[in-house]
From Swiss-Prot:
Consists of 3 domains; the N-terminus binds the ribosome, the middle domain has PPIase activity, while the C-terminus has intrinsic chaperone activity on its own. GO terms for molecular function: peptidyl-prolyl cis-trans isomerase activity; protein folding chaperone; ribosome binding. This is Trigger factor. SUPFAM superfamilies: FKBP-like, Triger factor/SurA peptide-binding domain-like, Trigger factor ribosome-binding domain. Keywords: Cell cycle, Cell division, Chaperone, Cytoplasm, Isomerase, Rotamase. Belongs to the FKBP-type PPIase family. Tig subfamily. One of its GO terms (biological process) is protein transport. Pfam families: FKBP_C, Trigger_C, Trigger_N. Residues 158-242 form the PPIase FKBP-type domain. It catalyses: [protein]-peptidylproline (omega=180) = [protein]-peptidylproline (omega=0). The keyword Signal does not apply. Its main location: cytoplasm. The lineage of its organism: Bacteria, Pseudomonadati, Acidobacteriota, Terriglobia, Bryobacterales.
Length: 422
């Protein structure tokens, strides 16, 4: 076996002429049974004519039979873990001669695993202050706020105006129109043009004014345009927050008092922050693990990871309402820009797999079943049907792999040497 470069290897294989002839005769006989030639009964055409008439088909069938068989045999003999599809070249196939060919392929690299426990990483459990708890509860109260109509007066900062809008200029096609839109005057989220032009108006007042929208505005019809609107103030409201009392706590769930609610909120904040801090620490552990191990990675793995990263970016764009086809991107440059990160991610995956093998870390049947049951609840389908679907499309394997990776990361985190943040 010859090492070409990195993980790429090649094999030159020779198949004895006698075996090639035997296989050729078998294929000729098979073709002969099915061939229908003028002047001969089905299956009775002479072999010499069959060989001449179907030379191309016979050659292809012999190659498709012998090459994969002998290649697989040689790969197993040399204990090679091939990734991707081997490239077959330099095929030498002539009568009464050995069949020779060259196979070029990539293999999973041999990794000499160094130290992976006791890795130093900055980490400390997060703190949750009383102010954090109060802020989170205030957010909940904001979500439960009621907007109450109040007597007409000029709009001021902090008021909520109920406005009807219709575009007069600046929009192609049908005008933009809304019968009832609620805006908070003076709020950061409200366009300044609305604040300036609505401030001081009273219910029943009307006004025309222009609003300039940024190029990245969510609505394609308004993005990057200067639009003239006709606005009518239809009402005035104020926001009323619910009182922070035991009754409010009881409405939110299984809490009897405000103190119980505060304790539950404190625990929820701590859990979320702890998860985020641990994820950050785990990422740093993986970075150190990758930096400490130098080995080549299969290009087929890197290309696959680049595709995954690009597809994730495309999905993110679509979710934001952006059509990637209109961005005029050089996709080759986009892909190449992902290469370094993709290569590190492949290395990380291979190293974590090596650690999980060394420590016998695996996903259990119960853990996989729990994820399937969760998916079944979300999809409102029978568990058995979802399990069958996941088994057929390979999702079960991906779930098991994801669980194994999470458990391996937790193993590394638990055995890391944690230091206080500098």
């Amino acid at each position: 076996m010859a090492l070409v470069e990195g993980c790429k290897h090649s094999l030159e294989i020779s198949i004895p002429a006698a075996e090639v002839e035997t296989e050729t005769n078998r294929v000729v006989l098979d073709v002969q049974k099915r061939a229908k030639l003028p002047g001969f009964r089905p299956g009775k055409s002479p072999a010499s004519i069959i060989r001449k008439q179907f030379a191309g088909d016979i050659r292809q069938q012999v190659l498709e039979s012998l090459i994969p068989t002998h290649l697989q045999k040689q790969l197993e003999a040399e204990n090679l873990n091939v990734v991707g599809t081997p490239d077959i070249s330099d095929v030498h196939f002539h009568d009464n001669e050995p069949l020779r060919f060259k196979a070029t392929f990539e293999v999973v690299p041999e990794i000499e695993l160094g130290e992976y426990t006791n890795i130093e990483v900055p980490y400390q459990d997060p703190e949750v202050t009383d102010e954090d708890v109060t802020s989170r509860i205030d957010e909940i109260r904001e979500q439960k706020a009621q907007y109450v109509n109040i007597d007409p007066r000029p709009l001021a900062d902090g008021d909520f105006a109920v406005v009807s809008l219709e575009s007069l200029e600046g929009v192609s096609g049908d005008p933009v129109k809304t019968d009832e839109m609620q805006l908070e005057i003076g709020a950061k989220e409200t366009f300044e043009a609305f604040n300036e032009n609505l401030r001081g108006l009273s219910p029943g007042d009307e006004k025309d004014f222009e609003v300039e929208y940024p190029a990245d505005y969510g609505s394609e019809k308004l993005a990057g345009r200067k639009v003239k609107f006709h606005a009518v103030v239809k009402g005035l409201r104020k926001k009323e927050l619910p009182e922070l009392d035991d009754e409010f706590a009881q409405e939110l769930g299984d809490y009897r008092t405000v103190d119980e609610l505060k304790e539950a909120v404190r625990k929820a904040i701590f859990s979320q922050r702890q998860y985020e801090a641990q994820q950050e620490a785990k990422n740093k552990i993986v970075d150190k693990l990758v930096d400490a191990h130098e080995f080549p990675v299969p290009e087929v793995f890197v290309e696959r990871q680049i595709r995954n990263r690009v597809e994730q970016s495309l999905r993110a764009m679509a979710e934001q309402g952006v059509d990637p086809s209109k961005l005029k991107l050089d996709w080759e440059k986009v892909k190449e820009a992902q290469r370094e990160k993709a290569t590190r991610e492949v290395k990380a995956s291979l190293l974590l797999g090596k650690v999980s093998d060394r420590e016998a870390i695996r996903a259990t049947r119960d853990e996989v079943d729990a994820e399937v049951e969760k998916a079944a609840r979300q999809q409102r389908k029978p568990v058995a049907a979802v399990h069958m679907e996941f088994e057929k499309d390979g999702t079960l394997g991906r779930i098991a792999s994801h669980i194994q990776t999470d458990k391996t990361l937790s193993f590394l985190f638990e055995r890391a040497r944690k230091t206080a943040e500098s």
